[in-house]
């Protein structure tokens, strides 16, 4: 049963006593090295698909990939960062709604800047906002939890993003 269940009415007194409601089941969980590395890997390896979609003029594909594949990893990282600042004793809330209270100053505003309309230039800005925010949050989280960051993975993905953004529409190769 849900840990936040309360009995509203038991006229016949047949329900067993319930423990007091608690949100501990929803608290941010401390990542181990495998979860942390997996989140970073998924973020850095799916972000280039957004760039390719933009270069090909497929803005809906780019936005879908950004929101469905990349954003969840960014939200994981921001949640873990919040966890390091609260002893992993809080919930991020639905879609990260409670994170502003637990993140460093300016971090939530940076996260909001990763949302874009369908204008390709705005999507590019959101891509780079997401990339820099993720990298900053990953470094802070890794430092707090004594976890390694795969710098080569991040650098390679960023180099690719910058390169694809500058490609002419008729390019036949990337590098």
What is each residue range found by the language model?
Residues 4-35:
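A short, charged helix-loop
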Residues 26-175:
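Conserved nucleotidyltransferase catalytic core and NTase-mimicking acidic/glycine-rich helix/loop elements
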